[in-house]
Amino acid sequence: MNRKKGDKGFESPRPYKLTHQVVCINNINFQRKSVVGYVELTIFPTVANLNRIKLNSKQCRIYRVRVNDLEAAFIYNDPTLEVCHHESKQRNLNYFSNAYAAAVSAVDPDAGNGELCIKVPSELWKHVDELKVLKVHINFSLDQPKGGLHFVVPNMEGSMAERGAHVFSCGYQNSTRFWFPCVDSYSELCTWKLEYTVDAAMVAVSNGDLVETVYTHDMRKKTFHYMLAIPTAASNISLAIGPFEILVDPYMHEVTHFCLPQLLPLLKHTTSYLHEVFEFYEEILTCRYPYSCFKTVFIDEAYVEVAAYASMSIFSTNLLHSAMIIDETPLTRRCLAQALAQQFFGCFISRMSWSDEWVLKGISGYIYGLWMKKTFGVNEYRHWIKQELDQIVAYELKTGGVLLHPIFGGGKEKDNPASHLHFSIKHPHTLSWEYYTMFQCKAHLVMRLIENRISMEFMLQVFNKLLSLASTASSQKFQSHMWSQMLVSTSGFLKSISNVSGKDIQPLIKQWVDQSGVVKFYGSFAFNRKRNVLELEIKQDYTSPGTQKYVGPLKVTVQELDGSFNHTLQIEENSLKHDIPCHSKSRRNKKKKIPLMNGEEVDMDLSAMDADSPLLWIRIDPDMSVLRKVEFEQSDFMWQYQLRYERDVVAQEEAILALEKFPTPASRLALTDILEQEQCFYRVRMLACFCLAKIANSMVSTWTGPPAMKSLFTRMFCCKTCPNIVKTNNFMNFQSYFLQKTMPVAMALLRDVHNLCPKEVLMFILDLIKYNDNRKNKFSDNYYRAELIDALANSVTPAVSVNNEVRTLDNLNPDVRLILEEITRFLNMEKLLPSYRHTITVSCLKAIRVLQKNGHVPSDPALFKSYAEYGHFVDVRIAALEAVVDYTKVDRSYEELQWLLTMVQNDPVPYIRHKILDMLTKNPPFTKNMESPLCNEALVDQLWKLMNSGTSHDWRLRCGAVDLYFTLFGLSRPSCLPLPELGLVLNLKEKKAVLNPTIIPESVANNQEPVNTTNNHGQPVVFQNTEDDHLIKETASSISGHQQGVKRKADMPLGSPLEPGQILEKNEDSKVKLKIRFSNSQEEEEIDMDTVHDSQAFIYHHLNMLERPSTPGKEQSSGEVTMHPVSAAPLSVFSKESNSSKHSDHHHHHHHEHKKKKKKTLQVWIRP
């Protein structure tokens, strides 16, 4: 949405306003995984000639549609089921991405479109002209849905409730259309009545207030009635049904928690903290939680760990934990806090359009960050900001940029705001999952930049203002035009900021929101003793992909002998050098304490520093107030001072990373001091362990004394009397617990002169395992033991093979034998006494793969494949799959690649399917620039089919398939495909002649859009035969020039550039002829399209078959057209409107006979 337009407020793309919707699901069958129900939408027309109503619906089989109790005809068409039609041999990704973006837009509710088009009965036209209310009643069913609703039905004895069978709604972005017909847009708000009839042993949890629960006469079923009086988008409606155990929150009675059977004790502990999160958000936003109740539901096989919907959130059951578990506690609390932040911004306040998504994700991420700062402290908060900043910088530099606010011009691809990507960013459903994750990360970082500019106080006032307006609007029961106040837009948000703070943040928005890219600084300095000036040089790289030029203020902090000083430099167009005056003279003779930034004064040993310079260390942009990467050069002693004495954790982490390049005794000492300092933040100490191991390896020839960290570990955690025996575990001090876990893992990375792990270190780790005693500890040690196995894996080095001997148990290296025995013992113990989240199994599987890769045990995926099967715990499956993916790459195994791809198609768990594609993309068996035996035509076809039609039920999965295809084959036609024959395809059903699409040269294909051939008047050029005009009337599209769904059968439309030597002609008498000029002569052959039409009519009369109509949502051959003659209104009325979009797979559904028309394609091959 453009800003200029945005100032007028919300303009609906639909010719009606939805005010209320009823969803009634009166039958759920867990055995068959099916759902039957109806919806009723209350619609107010906003234009007098409303005669079509477009709604969203995927997978639903629609039985009957009534408008105000009159039967209504409808057309169902979903161009996303099959993006490029199957006669196409197109295999380049550019083509697919354009076609996919077009298909998604063709049914995008934000453009007023939908898969379901309902014809308003002619009897109601007068009623509509008076703008009177319409009630649209739709009966539908779902049979084994592949997306939107996920059934979990354990295969065991007993009733469904005893088995713990449950079902829940899920999906990426607006995916409600997958389980009931609706307007699946975040900007169409209405009130809701939700009814679910379930078995008496089941509980249905949904949005809003539970009004009543009514049992049937035989007491075998009950109906849950929910009312949601706050106007809400269909995309924020959710459902969970299962034999849940129920816990009313003891601190807040309006909050209810639900979990699967026998997990109630874990639920009590996990949610005991939630009321504090509520209090925090209500306090900072000075606003009550917007709904009258809140429900948390913990389910198995979750789509994502946290999914927020209006007044309820669905969580993964794996987040539940007992009081004995340390590591999971902060992670789960963070998930709960994220979900609650999204209740305010995301569910209660919704977005006006996709280009405003960044505002909601930014605000919810920002207030979640404030909660984190209060709960875990400033150090943890700053560490998190640094981590997020590093992630977004790495991603943007790798892919070329993340754009928060894509403003779409005329909708042409040449205005494509992200031409560097292999997918369109104009719609959430075309985005790579990784891109969307990074998008959310960047959004909250930009909110923090806005806070730096206007202050936190004003920031919170803006949020409060947005919530107050929305709250007032939501209580306007009969003034639905007021509800748009509950939608946030970029322009509205910026207006609010300028009203509240009086500050102009336009330059900041222009820099970080309206354009993509991060800043890359390179800094170095010299001290001019004569002038007592620090000469700082700052260069920028703004030519690499993903970078942008920064002009503006930049803070530099200089720590001198007399204290710490902040300087703000103005980064101009060309300025590189900046002179900064120094405050201190170099005076090292006076013994005086040195003041630090936080007011502390410390004694320092200044013997290491440069005698002529008063500078201790320098930091560029210490507050991370620019999205940037800084590479700064200063001497090793300055990094050592910075590590020891700078109190900011980010500065300490930067110093540790820099010291890896300076392996000297002084660096070793600085790192050891940090490890011993108990006041130092535990994450910094953990990082120092790994840096110390790297330095020790670089200094291996000059290192003296015991291996790095060994004496420190012994002193901290071992018995005084017997230093090789570890004390009984006591994890009461969490900081030392994390250090105790990390040190052995880092020590195992030590190597001697022969590049082997020192025997002393290996024996030390084996002793830690042997003497580990957790009997007196009140906390579980499962994470600690898992890290000890990781340490064993880290100690493994490549095997030295003699005469290519085959590895057997008898000739195993004795050290490796010890490691393998421990791993086997751990794995067997796990079967008897499984650890929390099976952390031990996960570490063992990773260790076995390390042994395989290093040549100690035969490389074989069989063990991993057995652990990857459905039924194992999800973390175990992912660890096993990671090993199979790695094996596929290292051993170039086509068989395992096929096994993985079969799993992507058939595994019952959506998250696992998504993860396999993700792992293959990150660790691919080959890439577009390599020759590989795995790259063949069958694989190309298989992956093409997967992304083209095999993943239409899950947006995230389809985008994952696109990512993998891009990684393996790139944007153009895969190199392993044979060159196609030159050919012309005549498509009889389409009545179009098309060049064989496989032979478009890449230069053309790369710019190709699946655009309809249009003549000057914007009408599609279609060869039409009047005799079946009444069947399918061609009409131009309502969406801008390049209509998506229209006639998208022809893969290379006539509008595309033709090969040299081919001419398309239309004669005055409108006889269409196609001329083909052979390259070796000047003669032209003509094909008369009339002949084609005659044969088309002939085929039409002979191929009419009577068949049951295919179910909308089930993929079908693209040529099928299901016709239902309508008794109420003659079909010719369908052609009445000229703006209706006409798509590829048409189902004119009604309750009469069904005819199916088969498609024939005549191919004329021409050989030059």
Swiss-Prot record:
One of its GO terms (molecular function) is chromatin binding. Residues 1144-1161 have a biased composition (Basic residues). Its main location: nucleus. It comes from Gallus gallus (Chicken). The TFIID basal transcription factor complex plays a major role in the initiation of RNA polymerase II (Pol II)-dependent transcription. TFIID recognizes and binds promoters with or without a TATA box via its subunit TBP, a TATA-box-binding protein, and promotes assembly of the pre-initiation complex (PIC). The TFIID complex consists of TBP and TBP-associated factors (TAFs). One of its GO terms (biological process) is transcription initiation at RNA polymerase II promoter. It is found in: Nucleus. Keywords: Nucleus, Transcription, Transcription regulation. Component of the TFIID basal transcription factor complex, composed of TATA-box-binding protein TBP, and a number of TBP-associated factors (TAFs). This is Transcription initiation factor TFIID subunit 2. Pfam families: TAF2_3rd. GO terms for cellular component: transcription factor TFIID complex.
